[in-house]
Amino acid sequence: MNLAAYFPVLLFLIVGTGLGVALVSIGKILGPNKPDTEKNAPYECGFEAFEDARMKFDVRYYLVAILFIIFDLETAFLFPWGVALRDIGWPGFMAMMIFLLEFLLGFAYIWKKGGLDWE
């Protein structure tokens, strides 16, 4: 395998990273640093802060976010499978049906355990 063909990519990564680090460093060194309480306060659309900026979220929001990511990944696997269905034949079809069955069983388990209830 000829690794010389990948040299431009490596050079691009090195130059890009170096330029980014250099610009951030120059800004940090040359920029004024005069913090005060007003600058350090959290910004809420021009209004005074209503509550503490570090308020706690209910765990159910995180559960819904994780479930969304899981089922979003399922959709990401479904699209290329649908495009290549004629090329992969019955073995690919059966593999995806097993994959979908696992997700449906997981969804049924979450539903039965009350993971989707908000009360």
Curated annotation (Swiss-Prot):
Keyword presence, Electron transport: no
Major subcellular location class: membrane
Annotated membrane topology: Multi-pass membrane protein
GO CC field: NADH dehydrogenase complex; plasma membrane
UniProt catalytic activity: a quinone + NADH + 5 H(+)(in) = a quinol + NAD(+) + 4 H(+)(out)
Function field: NDH-1 shuttles electrons from NADH, via FMN and iron-sulfur (Fe-S) centers, to quinones in the respiratory chain. The immediate electron acceptor for the enzyme in this species is believed to be ubiquinone. Couples the redox reaction to proton translocation (for every two electrons transferred, four hydrogen ions are translocated across the cytoplasmic membrane), and thus conserves the redox energy in a proton gradient.
NAD listed as a keyword: yes
Name the record gives this protein: NADH-quinone oxidoreductase subunit A
A Pfam short name: Oxidored_q4
Source species taxonomy: Bacteria, Pseudomonadati, Pseudomonadota, Betaproteobacteria, Burkholderiales
InterPro entries (UniProt xref): NAD(P)H_OxRDtase_bac/plastid, NADH_UbQ/plastoQ_OxRdtase_su3, NDAH_ubi_oxred_su3_sf
EC number: 7.1.1.-
Source organism (scientific name): Paraburkholderia xenovorans (strain LB400)
Keyword set, alphabetical order: Cell inner membrane, Cell membrane, Membrane, NAD, Quinone, Translocase, Transmembrane, Transmembrane helix, Transport, Ubiquinone
Subunit structure: NDH-1 is composed of 14 different subunits. Subunits NuoA, H, J, K, L, M, N constitute the membrane sector of the complex.
Location(s) in or outside the cell: Cell inner membrane
Bilayer-crossing regions: 7-27, 63-83, 88-108
